[in-house]
Amino acid sequence: MALELNQIKQILQKPTKRQTIQKAVNMQRRLRFHTETNVAVSDINQPTTIFLDWVRRLLPKDKFNIFLHLFKFPLPTPAVVEDVYRELERVFYSRNSSSSYQFTDSELAEDWSQYKKNNLNEPEVWKTTGWKRMQVSPNSILVVDLPQVQTSLRPEPYFYWLEIDAVIDYQTFRLDENQFEWLIFKQPEHRIAVFDDTSIRVYQLNEKNEIQSLISEAKHDLGYCPARFFWSTQLNEKNKDLKKNPITKELSNLDWYLFFSISKQHLDLYAPYPIYSAYEADCNFENNETGDYCDGGFLRNAKGEYKILNDGTVEKCPCCSEKRIAGPGSFLEVPIPNQSEGVADMRNPVQITTIDKDSLDYNVNECARLKNEIVISVVGSGGTVSEKEAINETQVTANFESKTSVLNALKTNFELAQKFVEDTVCKLRYGGAFISSSVNWGT
């Protein structure tokens, strides 16, 4: 669909895909939160806030404050995700991989072989940039573009991954929802690019974000828009424009894994720093100038009245109130037993409260269970490299088929992306001299 200028102006005023684009951006931020090894909350502020707000609703205020003190980058979840992707990376080392290209002239085949290696950095680009984009930007878009000025005998098309947050609006192709009829996205220097099935245009915008002038226009004879979604696997039937990478379905489990990992750290503090308790001694704090004195950790004035602060709370004793916070390494004073009935209290006057072993074991086991569940769900049955339990031949076959199914899904996505890029580049560079191609990443 070739867009007219007035259509582009209307789209800029009222883009139809704004909500879908924002959903994709938010989902990718959650992926980054659990995938990338960040060192500061500023790198991924929004998903961090969402996670901590969720935890805040689960815990009492004092426990949440402790959780915040223990929450620190880098997080433990990227290590789990890294283990998952280390298993899935085998998709690049499959057997019997092959690719073939047909041209009307054999010399063009040699030219293409050199061009895709030297100019497109294939096949390495799929193992590096493509692999990373799959992990954190499955909603990114593959764009095949042309330089504004042709400097050689043949056109020199190139491709890149366009982040979804740079997109203004788009319309997908009716017969293939991964390809576009047209695409409009932001460019540097307050410009926009418009891709459709007849041309590639760049417009300059004014301060009001209105089209000011046409910067460049490159006509093409592709018959389709030279852009498509990088990843083909849809999130679900209702959200076909949102793409699902291998760990998308495990984002909630990753949240829980992070929660229990940090909760375990809290429990771990009680091992080297248990809570000590002993019979309380009367606090003898007294302010000689004002007459204020301590009564049970709070202040009374010279008249015996509690001292009320501006916020309505009773003022705490500056000497002993901090001793009453129960945390790792705290010292608590407990009331002296009442011996009015003449019964002697035989308890140890100084006691140590250690961590409850069952609570610690539960957190340790739950972390291990969640990690194993995440790995198996993404990688396939028998997700770990080593198996402690003996398994029979049928189980071995089932595990192999489970893993193979996962790798085949990855393989298909990369094959479709690579074929689109290479076919489009070949058509732009060689025109009708390019016949067809075949891309197979093997088994």
Where do the PLM segments sit?
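Intrinsically disordered, low-complexity boundary segments flanking structured domains
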Residues: 75-79, 88, 121-133, 139, ...
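Non-transmembrane, amphipathic alpha-helical segments
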Residues: 355, 359-362, 366, 395, ...
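Extended, helix-rich architectural segments
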Residues: 1-162
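Extended, charged amphipathic alpha-helical segments
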Residues: 233-390
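C-terminal helix-loop subdomains that flank or include functional centers
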Residues: 369-386, 390, 400-443
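Short, charge-rich amphipathic segments
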Residues: 3-23, 34-69, 288-312, 328-356, ...
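Short, compositionally biased low-complexity segments
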Residues: 87-91, 104, 218-239, 338-347
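Extended, regular secondary-structure scaffolds
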Residues: 109, 113-253
